[in-house]
Amino acid sequence: MLRTLTALVALALAHGPPAADPVVHWRHSTSLGRPDHGSLVNGVQLPAEGITFFTWDPVLLRSPDRGSRRWGNDRLVRMVQEVVGEYWLENPDAPRVCIGDLSRRHGGDFQPKHASHQNGLDVDVYYPRLDRRERPPIRPAQIDRPLAQDLVNRFIAAGATRIFVGPNTHLKGPRRIVQVLVLHDNHMHVRIAGP
């Protein structure tokens, strides 16, 4: 992780004025129950944006995502930051990664929009766009598939246990991990294992 952070700082300095990532208040989290019926203890809040990512509110259709929708298990928040950091280092011309909802501060029911996301182990990651705009794609034809596949591969390598992708994205991975699910043509749903 230190190597990744050092490289990110060097890359940020090479691309103009330094942009500091906001401080994350790390603590050990506990995810209880199931993704569709659970809670989160000592969640960690993902910052609204950073050097390598920004957040998107799928209800208000704007950036950043509200703070109440950006809580996750510490392992999930760390994974997101590491994956998008390494992705950005390998794809420096790519736009920042668009991160959607995680969970609520204490987990629990997360309506509208989500049947899961209740115990801090789920995150929505929007597919990169061909036009490089920093907003979610509206149609699958707008997806930069090589960059999207790169993100899928990185989340698999980082230990994701499930990644739901849309039927029209044509993204691939091991069947036990990457599964096609309707209503996921503009974002992937990444899940990590519970404790």
Predicted feature descriptions by range:
Residues 5-18:
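Hydrophobic h-region of N-terminal signal peptides that target proteins for export
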Residues 91-92, 115-120, 156-157, 181-184:
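Extracellular/periplasmic catalytic domains that process cell-envelope and extracellular macromolecules
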Residues 23-32, 79-113, 162-178:
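Extended, low-complexity, intrinsically disordered C-terminal regulatory tails
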Residues 24, 134-195:
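Catalytic cores and adjacent binding grooves of peptidoglycan-active enzymes
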Residues 107-110, 114-143, 147:
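Mid-length scaffold segments of soluble, non-membrane domains
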Residues 33-99, 150, 154:
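Active-site acidic/histidine clusters and adjacent loop/turn architecture
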Residues 102-105, 128-130, 168, 193-195:
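Solvent-exposed coil/turn segments that connect beta secondary-structure elements
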Residues 98-100, 122-126, 189-191:
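Soluble periplasmic/extracytoplasmic beta-strand elements of cell-envelope proteins
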